[in-house]
Amino acid sequence: MRPPLREGTWLCVKLQFVPQWSNLKRYYFATMEGLTDCIYRRTHHAYFPGIHSYYMPFLSPTVHRQLTSRESRELPPADSVPFRTVPQLLTKVPEDFLWAAQQCRDRGYDEVNLNVGCPSGTVVSKGKGSGMLADLEQLDRFLDAVFAAAPLAVSVKTRLGIADPEEFPRLLEVFNRYPIKELTVHPRVRKQFYDGDVYLDSFCYCQENSRNPVCYNGNIRTLSELNAFEKEFPQVEAVMMGRGLIGNPGMLTGTDAATLEAFHNALLEEYLVVFGGSRNAMFRMKENWRYMLRLFEGSEKLGKRLRKTTDLAEYRGIVSEIFHTLPLSRELRADW
């Protein structure tokens, strides 16, 4: 349970009042493919510290036993990163998982996360991600082989099943057979993707019946939603968030337009160097703006101009206008 607020622990920001509490809970930043790369993680931590662990874009090991250049870049030595990161593995082959886990250990990581929750059609069609939930006997064999030889701690991220939340009790029986460091549950089924309501009754079942520590993930997009969840589930010690933190990078710490602008500009400059030009750098930044624009009131007109521009100077001008003329909303409009 969050302790009582001490005197002076409310931070006033532009049109926001954000509580700053003693962080007894653990807050994780979920991976978002194409957004939360090593540059984003490093820059976010510099401007908005307080995240317990950042989860990396998943590695997909193959029989070739070789990391791609992108994967190597995303997996630097753990002691070279000034915050905690967790590599995420996406595979249905135990031997490939164990090889990749050893690569992570060799680089100094103390945990890897098995992703059996990704609902992407291209992933599921290969029997990976949430596709592994379709055959519990095969999943059991996979986990048995992995935990018999894993060189470091293994956590798991899962959904409730493929099509029906009633699949989850049998799935949890499988997970309960293994010493999973932490079971992150996104209480939707695969066919929902990210639409529709989450099944909180199934998450309650998990809380009551899991033999392993449990982390919650799903539909925590604003500080109000986080506070409401923690009030209903005070015993949950870890929460993973994704789109909400992309949309409001300072959701946990509080922020103002000046800090957001500095964060944005630092990201942009890094991407201009890495991508070697403005086109791809602006494309990456526009992906961030897809969520972050919802933090500003009356952003429709400037947002339309932002999406259309292909000129870096014009892009910079529009962004400056957003930060200097549009007020921050009291809370992110999570209407995606």
How does the language model describe each region?
Residues V13-N23, Y27-Y28, E33, C38-I39, ...:
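Alpha/beta catalytic cores of nucleotide-metabolism and tRNA/nucleoside-modifying enzymes
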Residues K14-W21, M32-Q103:
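Glycine-rich, positively charged N-terminal anion/phosphate-binding segment
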Residues Y27-A30, Y54-M56, T85-L89, V112, ...:
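Hydrophobic faces of well-ordered beta-strands that scaffold small-molecule active sites
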Residues M32-G34, L59-P61, L90-K92, G117-P119, ...:
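Active-site beta-loop-alpha junctions enriched in small/polar residues
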Residues A101-V112, V116-G121, K126, E137-N212:
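Alpha/beta enzyme core
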Residues G127-L133, T255:
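Short glycine-enriched, charge-decorated loop/helix-capping segments at active-site entrances
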